[in-house]
């Protein structure tokens, strides 16, 4: 089942924990964050942060409210200024109505990495297809890569005990400013390379 299927009420504050470890590992297969400072601004229950820490990243966790996982700060990412620079910002952002909040996360993240760094957001695989988002993708010089997930994420456990059958495809979208003049074509990757791994 997907995040926002009509038969399910939207979760308060769009809290959809990325419980499956392979999702974050798919990013790490293409981005080395070992020894890097990483801000997880929608840490939720800490699932993604724990995988990043296990990979050697120094993770700073925040969220708009406390969901029980130890946070370094509590606040709205789109309004926060930590007064420091991070090597990367990595998160599964809340979508909000018509995914407007996710767009705001991209815009805010781009401001935070303006002095260098990487922004990696987990989003629906077709998020870059909307014409109104061209400024964030096709026309954005910082848009660097897309990592298409070859498995579907299970967000909820079915109460009837049956095997979940998620319907939504997702991808990691990556932005990174460089000193190159002009724009280079974004790269497309796929992960995990074995779509049946972890089953």
Residue ranges and their predicted role:
Residues 1-199:
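Class I S-adenosyl-L-methionine-dependent methyltransferase catalytic core
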């Amino acid at each position: 089942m997907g995040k926002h299927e009509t038969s399910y009420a939207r979760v308060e504050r769009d809290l959809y924990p990325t419980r499956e470890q392979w999702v974050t590992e798919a990013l790490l297969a293409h981005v080395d964050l070992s020894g890097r400072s990483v801000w997880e601004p929608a840490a939720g229950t800490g699932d993604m942060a724990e995988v990043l820490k296990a990979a050697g990243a120094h993770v700073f966790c925040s969220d708009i409210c406390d969901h029980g996982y130890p946070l370094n700060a509590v606040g709205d990412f789109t309004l926060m200024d930590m007064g420091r620079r991070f090597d990367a910002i990595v998160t599964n952002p809340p979508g909000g109505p018509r995914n407007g909040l996710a767009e705001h996360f991209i815009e805010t993240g781009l401001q935070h990495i303006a002095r260098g760094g990487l922004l990696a957001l987990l989003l629906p695989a077709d998020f870059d297809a909307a014409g109104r988002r061209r400024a964030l993708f096709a026309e954005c010089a910082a848009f660097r890569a897309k990592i298409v997930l070859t498995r579907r994420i299970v967000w909820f456990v079915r109460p009837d005990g049956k095997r979940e059958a998620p319907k939504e495809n997702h991808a990691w979208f990556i932005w990174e400013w460089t000193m190159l003049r002009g724009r280079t074509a974004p790269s497309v990757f796929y992960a995990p390379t074995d779509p049946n791994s972890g089953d």
